[in-house]
Amino acid sequence: MALPYLEAVLCFMILMYIFETYLDIRQHRALKLPTLPKPLVGVISGEKFERSRAYSLDKSKFHFIHEAVTILMDTTILYYRVLPWVWKKSGELATNAGLNAENEILHTLAFLAGVMIWSQITDLPFSLYSTFVIEAKHGFNKQTIWLFIRDMIKGILLSILLGPPIVAAIIIIVQNGGPYLAIYLWGFMFALSLVMMTIYPIVIAPLFNKFTPLPEGVLREKIEKLAASLSFPLKKLFVVDGSTRSSHSNAYMYGFFKNKRIVLYDTLIQQCSSEDEIVSVIAHELGHWKLNHTVYSFVAVQLLMFLQFGGYTLVRNSKDLFESFGFEDQPVIIGLIIFQHTIIPVQHLLSFCLNLVSRAFEFQADAFAKNLGYAPQLRAALVKLQEENLSAMNTDPWYSAYHYSHPPLVERLSALEDADSKKEN
């Protein structure tokens, strides 16, 4: 007797929706609290708190609607076997276009084109509302509708350019991988990730934002001095025009081996009240590098990817699995999609565990910056960024533990103060 794979997947999807909605309700209640957490009283202004509260509540209400629509569409698509219908119709369209639908690569590309069109249509209303209603209402959106459309078109063109060769390579590997399929798939994805990590900041990111060298001055001198003191191989220091799209701020680093680069959002420079606050944020980021957090995270992702491909090889020829989802044939891309659905429970658990590790890394990077003497500046910068980004001040502990990759502000400030107290004692 065939196992009810589809029914099990649908059941877990609904259970996870109920569980995550419960967490969302807890968070919504926390956001409605009319007072600041005690540690933030006197630190965050009342005006910023009210603005943050209003922004967070608007996003929370929007999230409830988006998630409800998403689970309704996803369960409908699976229950009514929409994917097998799309697969069949995409083959017919490919044939009508003069293509050979017997060629799995061509058939798959036609199928994915249909999926992409559907995804764009269903995501567009939510994206427009989020950007031009919620973000605009609270003073964050800086995009015009034409810039929004231009970015969307660029994203679609990149998918059309990069997607087909990647999909074709995966299909060929699966068809010819034999007993070492998991190794070949992982090797390909490992190489692809290295290539994308290399070309994204150099080729792709500049298509959407303008990167300019940080001008000579006190800030540049302090960052270069900090990098040199840590033997960080800083080659280039950029400012990105994030303000053309949003008032949100950030900073990050990238690059391999001796070719490291640091990128500052222009909004970060505008929002921090001193160069030392900005440098403290960079000290935190360099802490991730010095403590090998980036390497550990990359290795963990690669290991999980290899295990995932190993699991896929065990079920890719399961006729019962494909039939449960309504497929008579066993196309490679469909097998991967079905497998992703069957391991949803494991993915949720792993996501939770990775968030735990990520939060631990954030505490360690904060402590690293503090040990360099930037504790006061980092506290001030964290508070400033929390205020300017209107991030949630009150958070439910269950919600933050499950969803947050970064600790809430209260916990980060408390950890920095505890570190100071231990040092004084």
From Swiss-Prot:
<feature type="transmembrane region" description="Helical">
    <location>
        <begin position="62"/>
        <end position="80"/>
    </location>
</feature>
<dbReference type="GO" id="GO:0046872">
    <property type="term" value="F:metal ion binding"/>
</dbReference>
<feature type="active site" description="Proton donor">
    <location>
        <position position="366"/>
    </location>
</feature>
<feature type="binding site">
    <location>
        <position position="288"/>
    </location>
    <ligand>
        <name>Zn(2+)</name>
    </ligand>
</feature>
<feature type="binding site">
    <location>
        <position position="362"/>
    </location>
    <ligand>
        <name>Zn(2+)</name>
    </ligand>
</feature>
<keyword id="KW-0645">Protease</keyword>
<keyword id="KW-0812">Transmembrane</keyword>
<dbReference type="InterPro" id="IPR027057">
    <property type="entry name" value="CAXX_Prtase_1"/>
</dbReference>
<comment type="function">
    <text>Proteolytically removes the C-terminal three residues of farnesylated proteins.</text>
</comment>
<feature type="transmembrane region" description="Helical">
    <location>
        <begin position="332"/>
        <end position="352"/>
    </location>
</feature>
<dbReference type="Pfam" id="PF01435">
    <property type="entry name" value="Peptidase_M48"/>
</dbReference>
<dbReference type="GO" id="GO:0071586">
    <property type="term" value="P:CAAX-box protein processing"/>
</dbReference>
<keyword id="KW-0862">Zinc</keyword>
<feature type="transmembrane region" description="Helical">
    <location>
        <begin position="3"/>
        <end position="23"/>
    </location>
</feature>
<dbReference type="GO" id="GO:0004222">
    <property type="term" value="F:metalloendopeptidase activity"/>
</dbReference>
<keyword id="KW-0479">Metal-binding</keyword>
<feature type="transmembrane region" description="Helical">
    <location>
        <begin position="295"/>
        <end position="315"/>
    </location>
</feature>
<feature type="transmembrane region" description="Helical">
    <location>
        <begin position="109"/>
        <end position="129"/>
    </location>
</feature>
<protein>
    <recommendedName>
        <fullName>CAAX prenyl protease 1 homolog</fullName>
        <ecNumber>3.4.24.84</ecNumber>
    </recommendedName>
</protein>
<feature type="active site">
    <location>
        <position position="285"/>
    </location>
</feature>
<dbReference type="InterPro" id="IPR001915">
    <property type="entry name" value="Peptidase_M48"/>
</dbReference>
<comment type="similarity">
    <text>Belongs to the peptidase M48A family.</text>
</comment>
<keyword id="KW-0378">Hydrolase</keyword>
<dbReference type="InterPro" id="IPR032456">
    <property type="entry name" value="Peptidase_M48_N"/>
</dbReference>
<keyword id="KW-0472">Membrane</keyword>
<feature type="binding site">
    <location>
        <position position="284"/>
    </location>
    <ligand>
        <name>Zn(2+)</name>
    </ligand>
</feature>
<dbReference type="GO" id="GO:0005789">
    <property type="term" value="C:endoplasmic reticulum membrane"/>
</dbReference>
<keyword id="KW-1133">Transmembrane helix</keyword>
<feature type="transmembrane region" description="Helical">
    <location>
        <begin position="188"/>
        <end position="208"/>
    </location>
</feature>
<keyword id="KW-0256">Endoplasmic reticulum</keyword>
<keyword id="KW-0482">Metalloprotease</keyword>
<dbReference type="Pfam" id="PF16491">
    <property type="entry name" value="Peptidase_M48_N"/>
</dbReference>
<feature type="transmembrane region" description="Helical">
    <location>
        <begin position="155"/>
        <end position="175"/>
    </location>
</feature>
